[in-house]
């Protein structure tokens, strides 16, 4: 999920461990089965904040009695601050997790680009190759394996 879709998630969109949403960026439908740890987190949040509409409502919105999710910009800001605090330098944002997740799926599936493309909800393979830097990875791997 893109961070904007994740923070906009409402409790009523989580049904039997699955979500079916319309992506904000593309307008395409996306269905996902949520892992057990995510479902446990959602259940804890629901129990702690039974009147919230959104799974990720900020403390500020809650104190102002505003039914709105946390802003994606705030999530990226918090991630960047956390990365800096543990010594990770450079650009780190919520989007970094989407790219890392896509790369992890690609590598764990024996380089199944079609699976990565499906998970990322890309319309064409060219976008997925560019997104995952596959050409760059392949060239680097071949060069490193050369016996010069």
Where in the sequence are the language-model features?
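Active-site-proximal segment of tyrosine recombinases
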Residues: 5-7, 92, 102, 110-121
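Catalytic-site neighborhood detector that most strongly recognizes the C-terminal catalytic loop/helix
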Residues: 23-27, 120-145
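Conserved tyrosine-mediated DNA breakage-rejoining catalytic core shared by Y-recombinases
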Residues: 1-40
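N-terminal core-binding DNA-recognition domain of tyrosine site-specific recombinases/integrases
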Residues: 31, 65-74, 91-93
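Short basic/aromatic active-site micro-motif
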Residues: 89-105
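Basic, alpha-helical nucleic-acid-contacting "clamp/cap" segments
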Residues: 24-65
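Mobile genetic element proteins and their domesticated derivatives, centered on retroelements
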Residues: 21, 56, 79, 128-131
């Amino acid at each position: 999920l893109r961070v904007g879709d994740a923070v906009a998630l409402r409790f009523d969109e989580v049904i039997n461990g699955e979500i079916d949403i319309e992506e904000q960026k593309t307008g395409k439908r996306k269905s996902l089965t949520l892992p057990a740890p995510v479902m446990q987190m959602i259940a804890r949040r629901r129990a702690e904040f039974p009147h919230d509409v959104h799974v990720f409502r900020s403390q500020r919105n809650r104190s102002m009695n505003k039914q709105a999710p946390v802003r994606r910009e705030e999530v990226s800001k918090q991630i960047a601050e956390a990365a800096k605090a543990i010594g990770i330098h450079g650009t780190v944002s919520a989007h970094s997790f989407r790219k890392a997740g896509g790369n992890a799926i690609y590598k764990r599936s024996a380089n199944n680009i079609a699976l990565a493309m499906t998970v990322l909800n890309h319309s064409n393979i060219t976008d997925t190759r560019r997104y995952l830097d596959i050409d760059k990875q392949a060239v680097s791997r071949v060069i490193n394996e050369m016996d010069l």
